[in-house]
Each structure stands twice: as C-alpha cells, then as structure tokens.
Amino acid sequence: APKNIVLFGATGMTGQVTLGQALE
C-alpha cells in the first residue's frame, strides 16, 4: 500500500511497514 507508506513516512521505516501493512 504505497499510499499508507507515504502517509506514515514520518513515523519511520518501521512505522511505514507496520502501519502501512496493517491498513492495507
């Protein structure tokens, strides 16, 4: 989910993967 990765980019790499995949 590229959109989520961009939205949570400020959270950090770990946050991108965790939150991005969770909301995918």
Swiss-Prot record:
Domain of life per record: Eukaryota
Entry keyword annotation includes NADP: yes
Description of pH dependence: Optimum pH is 5.0 for NADPH-methemoglobin reductase activity, and 6.5 for NADPH-diaphorase activity.
This enzyme's EC code(s): 1.5.1.30, 1.3.1.-, 2.6.99.-
GO terms for cellular component: cytoplasm
GO biological process: heme catabolic process; megakaryocyte differentiation; negative regulation of insulin receptor signaling pathway
Compartments where located: Cytoplasm
Binding-site residues for NADP(+), renumbered to this chain: G9, T11, G12, T14
Keyword Phosphoprotein applies: no
Family: Belongs to the BLVRB family.
Subunit structure of this chain's protein: Monomer.
Protein name as catalogued: Flavin reductase (NADPH)
Organism of derivation: Aquarana catesbeiana (American bullfrog)
